[in-house]
Amino acid sequence: MNELLAEMAAVSSRRKQSKPRRMSGEGDAMMSPIDLSTKSFDENNCEKGAGGALPLEDRSNILPHFSVPFANPQQFLSLCAQLGNSSSRNVSSTASTTSSCPIQSCSQSFSSPAALTWHVLDAHEDEQEIFSCDVCTTTFSNGQDIREHKCQKTLASRSTSVPPSTIPSSVCFLSTPTTPCLQFSINESIGTSEIREEDEEEDMDVEDGEHVANQLFGHLLQKSDDKSKMASLFNHAFPPFAAFPNMPPPFLMRQPFDPRADVFAAGRHDNDDDWEALMEISTSDEAEKIRALVGDKAVPTTDPNQCILCRRVLSCKSALQMHYRTHTGERPFKCKICQRAFTTKGNLKTHMGVHRSKHSFRGLPISLPPQLAAMHQHQHQIAPPQRIHIHNPPTSAASAAAAVAQIQASQQCPICQQRFLNAGELAVHITEHRNSLTQPPRVMPTPTTTRVQTFPFVPFFTTPPSLNATDMSTQFNLANILSAQLKNDSSPNTDTSSVEEKITRDDPPKMASLSPSNSSDSSSSVRQDILESSEFEEKLKKLEEPPILEQQVSTTPNPKNENPLLAMQKMWAETEPPPPRQMPVLSKHQCGVCFKHFSSSSALQIHMRTHTGDKPFKCDMCGRAFTTRGNLKVHMGTHSWQQSPSRRGRRIFDVASSVTEKPMLQSPILPTSGAPGASPLAMLGPNGLSGLEMMMMLWRTVCSVCQKVCQSPNELEQHLKEHLNNGSSAAPTPLASAATPPPS
C-alpha cells in the first residue's frame, strides 16, 4: 500500500488528487469497488493477490464517488480522470498535463479535474473530439454522447465464461450493455463512501477546495432526467441476496407471459347476442361510381352538402353519403344469414332482430288425449331426433296420401329455410344456429339430419283434416298401449291375429300395428326408410294393387271376431272431439302461420296479406289488386299516357279529380270552340267509371283526326287505316259535324 502511495506521489506534480481504492475481500463480495484507472487494462494483473484482493494498477486517478443518475456513470468519471492525469504518455487522453483546457483557443487552467470537466462541458460544448474511450478509442464531443456510448469490445468480453470477480470494475463499468451493469448499486456507493472516509483520515492533505469542486461536479451530474434516475435506482438498488445464490436478478423475477391468456380472451365474449360476426360490410369505392354517373362535365355545387346529381341539399356530410347510395344503388351492409343487403348499418341492425328472437316451435300433434300428449312430449325431450320409419307399408290409396301428407308436414328453419321431418330435428338445428352466433365468423353449421327437398312445405297444418292422420311416433305409442291391454283379453290368438291383419290393411294410417307380437318386435324388426326414393316408389306401386287378403276377409265377415280395439277407436273418434291445438308462444312481430320474424308491425301486417289473400289496393284502369300502395304506384306507370314535366311528381290519385274538374282544358282531342255540342265524355254516358278511366278510354277510342268515338281500340285502328287510304280529306264524322258551329 505504501509503495503504491509513493508512486502516486512521484507522478502527481501538485498534490495528491486521488488515492487508491482498497478491494474488499470475501466478506465484502457484494460491494464491488469503483476503479477509476486511466491506464488500459492489463490482463496480466487479473490474478488475485494475497487475501483475495485484486492488485491495483500502478497509476490511478480516483475521484470521490457520487450517486449519479447516468446510465453508466463510471465510464463518464473515467474519462474525467483522464483530464487530470499529468505525466503518463501511455493513456489515450487529449486533456492537458496541467489541468488546463485542451482547447487551443482557451488558456484557462483549473485546480482540479472536476473544475476542468465543468468548464469543458459548459464553455466548449460544440467542440469536436474532446473525450475518448479507453477501450474502443471512440471520441466524443459532449457528455450526452458519452452517456449513450456502448462499448462493443467489452460487450464481447462479457459474453465469455470469466467469473465476475476476476474482471476489474473499470472494464465492467466501461461496458454499457442494454441494461446497466449489475455491480453498480446503492450498496456500492455506501461502501465506497466508507472507504473514502478511511482514506481521508489517512491522507489529511486533501484541500477543502477539491471537496467543493466535487460537490459542484456532483450537482452537475444530477441534472439528468428523473426517469433515468428512477430506473437506475429500481434496477440496481437491490443486488441478489447472498443467502440465495441461485436467485435470478430482480428484473428476471417478473411473471412470465402466459400464452393461454390470448386463447381464453379470443373465446370469451362479453355479450351472447354479439351479431357483429354475422354482418358483412363491403368496402367498395362509392366515389368511383358517383364519378361514373356524373361524367366529365360536372357542374360545381353551391353547397358542400349538395348532391352533384340531383342538386338536392342535405343536412350533413353523412346524410349526403347515404343519399348518394340511392343513385349508385350501393348497399354495403349485408346480412350473412339471409344475404339481404342494406344501405345503413342501422337498418341492418334492425333487420338482425328478425334472427335475434328465440324461435317458437310447433305445438303437439292434433287429436291426442292429455295422457298421450304428455307421453309424446316426454319422449321428444329424451329421445334423440330420428327419422320417421314405418313398420308396415300402407296398402291403400288413402294411406299413401296420408303418408305423403305426413312427409309434407315438414318443419322449416326460420333462419336458413331448411326443412326437417319433425320438431326435434328443427330444435337441434336452431340450437346450432344460436351456438354459432357467439363464435368467430365461419361457415354456417349444416345439420346431419336428412333434408326434405322433394315435397312442398305445408306452413301450419300438419295433415289435412279429412285424413285424420296423426304422427307416426304417436301411432306406435298408441299401438303399444292398446296392445298391452290386449294381453289380458281371453280371445283366441288366431282370431285376434287374423282380425288384426285385416285392421292393419283396412286402416293403416290410423293403426300401424295392433298385435302384441308386432308391437313387441317392432323395435327389433327391420324398418324401411320412406325417404329412399326407390323403395318408396315400390311401396306406392304395391298400394295401387288391391289386397287379396282384404277381399278374402271381406267376403266372409264374422261379427263374433270383431276386434274390441277397433270399436274403442271408433267410439273415441265419434264421441270425443279432438282437443284444441296448443298454439306456440309467438314473439312481438312473429307470424303465427309460418313463424317468420319481422322487424316491425307494419311489415308483419303486409306479410299477413300473403296468407289471407287480401289485396286492398286496386287499379281503376285494369282492375288488378295489390297488397301495398307502392306496388300499385309502380303498376300505374304502365297506364301513363304521357310523361310531361308538368305531370311528374303528382299523385296518381289526384289525376282523376283534376281531369274531371277541367276536361275541356286537359284533353287535346276535344274541340276548342265554345259552341254547344256533345262532348265525347258526355257521349260515354253515366257508366260509373272514374274520371281517370274515362280519360284513358277516350285516349284509346277517339280518333285524333275527326274526333270520332270508337267502341274499341281495334275499331279505332281500322278507322285510322281508312283515313290513311282515303287521304286526310275524309268526310267529317257526326261527332265532328255536331261539334263544329254552324256558319253565321
Swiss-Prot record:
<keyword id="KW-0539">Nucleus</keyword>
<dbReference type="InterPro" id="IPR051565">
    <property type="entry name" value="Sal_C2H2-zinc-finger"/>
</dbReference>
<feature type="compositionally biased region" description="Low complexity">
    <location>
        <begin position="513"/>
        <end position="525"/>
    </location>
</feature>
<keyword id="KW-0805">Transcription regulation</keyword>
<dbReference type="Pfam" id="PF12874">
    <property type="entry name" value="zf-met"/>
</dbReference>
<feature type="region of interest" description="Disordered">
    <location>
        <begin position="542"/>
        <end position="562"/>
    </location>
</feature>
<dbReference type="GO" id="GO:0072326">
    <property type="term" value="P:vulval cell fate determination"/>
</dbReference>
<dbReference type="GO" id="GO:0048333">
    <property type="term" value="P:mesodermal cell differentiation"/>
</dbReference>
<feature type="zinc finger region" description="C2H2-type 3">
    <location>
        <begin position="333"/>
        <end position="355"/>
    </location>
</feature>
<feature type="region of interest" description="Disordered">
    <location>
        <begin position="725"/>
        <end position="744"/>
    </location>
</feature>
<feature type="zinc finger region" description="C2H2-type 1">
    <location>
        <begin position="99"/>
        <end position="124"/>
    </location>
</feature>
<keyword id="KW-0479">Metal-binding</keyword>
<feature type="compositionally biased region" description="Basic and acidic residues">
    <location>
        <begin position="499"/>
        <end position="509"/>
    </location>
</feature>
<dbReference type="GO" id="GO:0014016">
    <property type="term" value="P:neuroblast differentiation"/>
</dbReference>
<dbReference type="GO" id="GO:0000122">
    <property type="term" value="P:negative regulation of transcription by RNA polymerase II"/>
</dbReference>
<keyword id="KW-0863">Zinc-finger</keyword>
<comment type="similarity">
    <text>Belongs to the sal C2H2-type zinc-finger protein family.</text>
</comment>
<dbReference type="GO" id="GO:0005634">
    <property type="term" value="C:nucleus"/>
</dbReference>
<dbReference type="GO" id="GO:0000981">
    <property type="term" value="F:DNA-binding transcription factor activity, RNA polymerase II-specific"/>
</dbReference>
<comment type="function">
    <text>Transcription factor, involved in positive and negative modulation of transcription. Binds to multiple DNA sequence motifs in the regulatory elements of target genes, including homeobox selector egl-5 and LIM homeobox mec-3. Involved in cell-fate regulation in multiple lineages, including neuronal, mesodermal and vulval. Required to regulate the fate of PLM touch receptor neurons, acting via negative modulation of transcription of egl-5 and mec-3. May modulate gene expression by interacting with different transcription factors during neuronal and mesodermal cell development.</text>
</comment>
<keyword id="KW-0862">Zinc</keyword>
<dbReference type="GO" id="GO:0060290">
    <property type="term" value="P:transdifferentiation"/>
</dbReference>
<keyword id="KW-0677">Repeat</keyword>
<dbReference type="GO" id="GO:0006979">
    <property type="term" value="P:response to oxidative stress"/>
</dbReference>
<feature type="zinc finger region" description="C2H2-type 2">
    <location>
        <begin position="305"/>
        <end position="327"/>
    </location>
</feature>
<feature type="zinc finger region" description="C2H2-type 5">
    <location>
        <begin position="589"/>
        <end position="611"/>
    </location>
</feature>
<dbReference type="GO" id="GO:0006357">
    <property type="term" value="P:regulation of transcription by RNA polymerase II"/>
</dbReference>
<feature type="compositionally biased region" description="Polar residues">
    <location>
        <begin position="487"/>
        <end position="497"/>
    </location>
</feature>
<dbReference type="GO" id="GO:0042692">
    <property type="term" value="P:muscle cell differentiation"/>
</dbReference>
<dbReference type="GO" id="GO:0010628">
    <property type="term" value="P:positive regulation of gene expression"/>
</dbReference>
<feature type="region of interest" description="Disordered">
    <location>
        <begin position="6"/>
        <end position="32"/>
    </location>
</feature>
<dbReference type="GO" id="GO:0008270">
    <property type="term" value="F:zinc ion binding"/>
</dbReference>
<feature type="region of interest" description="Disordered">
    <location>
        <begin position="487"/>
        <end position="530"/>
    </location>
</feature>
<protein>
    <recommendedName>
        <fullName>Spalt-like protein sem-4</fullName>
    </recommendedName>
</protein>
<feature type="compositionally biased region" description="Low complexity">
    <location>
        <begin position="728"/>
        <end position="744"/>
    </location>
</feature>
<feature type="zinc finger region" description="C2H2-type 4">
    <location>
        <begin position="411"/>
        <end position="433"/>
    </location>
</feature>
<feature type="zinc finger region" description="C2H2-type 6">
    <location>
        <begin position="617"/>
        <end position="639"/>
    </location>
</feature>
<dbReference type="InterPro" id="IPR036236">
    <property type="entry name" value="Znf_C2H2_sf"/>
</dbReference>
<dbReference type="GO" id="GO:0045944">
    <property type="term" value="P:positive regulation of transcription by RNA polymerase II"/>
</dbReference>
<dbReference type="GO" id="GO:0048626">
    <property type="term" value="P:myoblast fate specification"/>
</dbReference>
<feature type="compositionally biased region" description="Polar residues">
    <location>
        <begin position="551"/>
        <end position="561"/>
    </location>
</feature>
<dbReference type="InterPro" id="IPR013087">
    <property type="entry name" value="Znf_C2H2_type"/>
</dbReference>
